[in-house]
Amino acid sequence: MSLIEDCLRSYRFIAIDTEFPSTLRETTQHATDEERYMDMSFSVDRAKLIQLGLTLFDINGRIGGTWEINFSDFGVDDARNEKSIEFLRRNGLDLRKIREEGIRIEGFFSEMFWMLKKTRRNITWVTFHGSYDIAYLLKGFTGEALPVTSERFSKAVARVLGSVYDLKVMAGRCEGLSSRLGLETLAHEFGLNRVGTAHHAGSNNELTAMVFAKVLSPFPLFLRFGSLELRTIESEAIV
């Protein structure tokens, strides 16, 4: 944690990615945004975070450090989507090892919260298709269930986290790009390659940081208008 604290003094952007047991309630294709939010909060409130990736970087894309934090809270009897758990296993996540060697969610977020408060920096959070990422982050920092409506959720995010940018939303607003592009495809548009393994939080968020800086370079006005709204909550989480 001391290394993260040192980086916070020089880097105010944090790209995040999470790995979790996926959605616990299916959302219909034509559900309203509020219904999608209710399904997301149902899953996030009942499931436990497995892994969190953090990449601290600056506006020019210089990376201060990348961390992949494994949490020990997720156990064999906890709520899960079995297909998603098998997917994570196939992509190299050793859930037993994470359970044995990981750290507690509450302890990490408590320390991280006070670290951010101590540095007094205006942190900008960056995600890719990140409604669930932000929901788990908010839950971790507050230690509470998610707000009962999407409007209250957005207000809580603004109050607790401040500026949040979703790279997928940004891509949809940039000429020549599209919100339909996945992270890997978007990275290739800028000649960037992934470091590490896909579907691991650390690798995902480091790639998000690199692409964000590339997108921001020709479109610096994005930062003048404050944080973008979170992407409309999808019916199915991408883990």
UniProtKB/Swiss-Prot annotation:
Record's PANTHER family? CCR4-NOT TRANSCRIPTION COMPLEX SUBUNIT
Question: What highest taxon heads this organism's lineage?
Answer: Eukaryota
> How does this polypeptide assemble, per the annotation?
Component of the CCR4-NOT complex, at least composed of CRR4 and CAF1 proteins.
Q: Which residues form a coiled coil?
A: none
Gene Ontology CC terms, in alphabetical order: CCR4-NOT complex; cytoplasm; nucleus
What InterPro entries has UniProt attached to this entry?
Answer: CNOT7/CNOT8/Pop2, RNase_CAF1, RNaseH-like_sf, RNaseH_sf
Name the Enzyme Commission number(s) assigned to this protein: 3.1.13.4
What is the protein's name according to its record? Putative CCR4-associated factor 1 homolog 8
Which amino acids does the record list as binding a divalent metal cation? D17, E19, D133, N204
Where is it mainly found? nucleus
**What catalytic activity does the UniProt entry give for this protein?**
Exonucleolytic cleavage of poly(A) to 5'-AMP
Which segments cross the bilayer?
none
Give the organism, scientific name: Arabidopsis thaliana (Mouse-ear cress)
UniProt family annotation: Belongs to the CAF1 family.
This chain's function reads: Ubiquitous transcription factor required for a diverse set of processes. It is a component of the CCR4 complex involved in the control of gene expression.
Assigned keywords, A-Z: Cytoplasm, Exonuclease, Hydrolase, Metal-binding, Nuclease, Nucleus, RNA-binding, Transcription, Transcription regulation
Required co-factor? a divalent metal cation
